[in-house]
Curated annotation (Swiss-Prot):
An example Gene Ontology molecular-function term: 4 iron, 4 sulfur cluster binding
Residues annotated to bind [4Fe-4S] cluster: C357, C418, C421
Record's catalysed reaction(s): (2R,3S)-3-isopropylmalate = (2S)-2-isopropylmalate
NCBIfam families cross-referenced by the UniProt entry: leuC, PRK05478.1, PRK12466.1
EC identifiers of the protein: 4.2.1.33
Organism the protein comes from: Novosphingobium aromaticivorans (strain ATCC 700278 / DSM 12444 / CCUG 56034 / CIP 105152 / NBRC 16084 / F199)
InterPro entries linked to this entry: 3-IsopropMal_deHydase_lsu, Acnase/IPM_dHydase_lsu_aba_1/3, Acoase/IPM_deHydtase_lsu_aba, Aconitase_4Fe-4S_BS, Aconitase_4Fe-4S_dom, IPM_dehydratase_rel_enz, IPMI_cat
UniProt name for this protein: 3-isopropylmalate dehydratase large subunit
Pathway: Amino-acid biosynthesis; L-leucine biosynthesis; L-leucine from 3-methyl-2-oxobutanoate: step 2/4
Entry-linked Pfam families: Aconitase (PF00330)
Cofactors that this protein relies on: [4Fe-4S] cluster
Key words of the record: 4Fe-4S, Amino-acid biosynthesis, Branched-chain amino acid biosynthesis, Iron, Iron-sulfur, Leucine biosynthesis, Lyase, Metal-binding
Keyword hit for Transmembrane: no
Length: 478
């Protein structure tokens, strides 16, 4: 592509990071930031150790445990660590705690106030920046695209490669624009927007593409809302998702620990401003969504694409034209224990999870607390937990009194971590029970063997807690 041809945001970031272009169409890409956690890094560090290699840029690498950490008390009264029950989880956590300092990498551990979910910590610390290439051995790394970064998940062998070389060999993706225009109505949040997008595109709609989310709705969202949008880019098949950086982005980042300062800040902002997609630039595919079509949303099946407005009815498998979709719908209905024509608002839930890298930031806490204030969870809700995305989110929420709102409503107020987003730690949903969850995946067994997951926004999760069933949050709004 000519340097004078109009380019998209993604193309500009890509071009700025090409170290070498190869004849087969692949490019050696420089990686600006590398986030590591305890699950996908042990083998990578062991391979470095065996080869006698060092981490090339430890200053551009940040290690944060999150997947396996229990969200209940982690230290005894005298400061000793509470033992991790699962041996594999304990080994992974111990390995990261040992590997990070050995290789000169900053480690934000469970004793640090800044510890949390890696995709919350990165933006919060200013480690994630617009225009940067960011990788992590985790599916939801696209989250950082809410700041205008090109961020994507990688496998363990690639984790090793980035640690050793600070580069990756990649093929450039196609470009896709998802434009959301209009104005969101009360009760409709960023989570509802991205669930709706996933329903429109389908689980594979963005395959092979990097999506740029544009339009008035995206511009009007807060940075935390944009992080929620980009977080779920992988759920509609995209390699990454981007929101163009703007004045909101700069205000969010300024003064954060890893953000540039002084003259470096001014230079950075000048470059970030240049990243906007040029007038006349074209995308390989464009999808336009009208905000008036987006309602508080909920999933009914076992894929994030199985989305309905809360007022909707469970679909019949025969309503899908594609035979494979019909078969998938039958399997989903059997697993989820639902029947065609059932009202989503009639579905009872026994568990509530507010947390995950999608929805565990301070705005998410506030949105849920606003619905719960002065109310109690329903008697049929056995288990309701709120898991802040980081120690700093937890501290701020406590300063605002939000923890008291949750506790008085019958919720447990937990320590930061991935928690019940995935069945990899003690926070699991019992088999056959339902959970209204603010996480990003509703796959079979995602929250524990036999667990039935309904993805919703924090406000919708709070509403479900109060009524004991999936509920239109607008009915509870003052």
């Amino acid at each position: 592509m000519s340097s004078t041809a109009p380019r998209t945001l993604y193309q500009k970031i890509w071009d700025a990071h090409v170290v070498e272009r190869r004849d087969d169409g692949t490019c050696l890409i420089y990686i600006d930031r590398h986030l590591v956690h305890e699950v996908t890094s042990p083998q990578a560090f062991e391979a470095l150790r065996a080869a006698g290699r060092k981490v090339r840029r430890p200053d551009l690498t940040l290690a944060v445990p999150d997947h396996n950490l229990p969200t209940t008390a982690r230290r005894t009264a005298d400061g000793r660590r509470v033992p991790i029950a699962d041996p594999e989880s304990a080994q992974q956590l111990e390995a990261l705690e040992r590997n990070a300092p050995e290789f000169g990498i900053r480690y934000i551990g469970d004793a640090d106030d800044e510890q949390g979910i890696v995709h919350v910590v990165g933006p919060e610390q200013g480690f994630s920046l617009p225009g940067a290439t960011i990788v992590c051995g985790d599916s939801h790394t696209a989250c950082h695209g809410g700041l205008g970064a090109l961020a994507f998940g990688i496998g363990t062998s690639e984790v090793e490669h980035v640690l050793a070389t600070q580069t990756l060999l990649l093929k450039q993706s196609k470009t896709m624009e998802v434009r959301v225009e209009g104005e969101l109505t009360p009760g409709v949040t960023a989570k509802d927007v991205v669930l709706h997008i996933t329903g429109v595109l389908g689980a594979a709609g963005g395959t092979g593409s990097v999506i740029e989310y544009t339009g008035s709705v995206i511009r009007d969202l807060s940075i935390e809302g944009r992080l929620t949008i980009s977080n779920m880019a992988i759920e509609h098949g995209a390699r990454a998702g981007l929101c163009a950086p703007d004045e909101k982005t700069f205000a969010y980042l300024k003064g954060r620990p890893y953000a540039p300062r002084g003259e470096d800040w001014d230079k950075a902002v000048a470059w970030w401003k240049s990243l906007a997609t040029d007038p006349g630039a074209t995308y390989d595919k464009v999808v336009v969504i009208d905000a008036k079509d987006i309602a508080p949303s909920v999933t009914w099946g076992t894929s994030p694409e199985d989305v309905l407005p809360i007022s909707g009815l469970v679909p019949a498998p025969e309503s899908f034209a594609d035979p494979s979709k019909q078969e998938a719908a039958r399997a989903s209905l059997e697993y989820m224990g639902l029947v065609p024509g059932q009202r989503m608002e009639d579905v009872e839930v026994q568990n509530i999870f507010i947390g995950s890298c999608t929805n565990s930031r301070i705005e998410d806490m506030r949105a849920a607390a606003a619905i719960l204030k002065g109310r109690k969870k329903a008697d049929n809700v056995k288990w309701a937990i709120v898991v802040p995305g980081s120690g700093l989110v937890k501290k701020q929420a406590e300063e605002e009194g939000l923890d008291r709102v949750f506790i008085e409503a019958g919720f447990e107020w937990r320590e930061p971590g991935c928690s019940a987003c995935l069945g990899m730690n003690p926070d699991k949903v019992p088999a056959g029970e339902r959970c209204a969850s603010t996480s990003n995946r509703n796959f079979v067994g995602r929250q524990g063997p036999g667990a039935r997951t309904h993805l919703v926004s924090p406000a919708m999760a709070a509403a479900a807690a109060v009524t004991g069933r999936l509920t239109d949050v607008r009915k509870l709004m003052a």
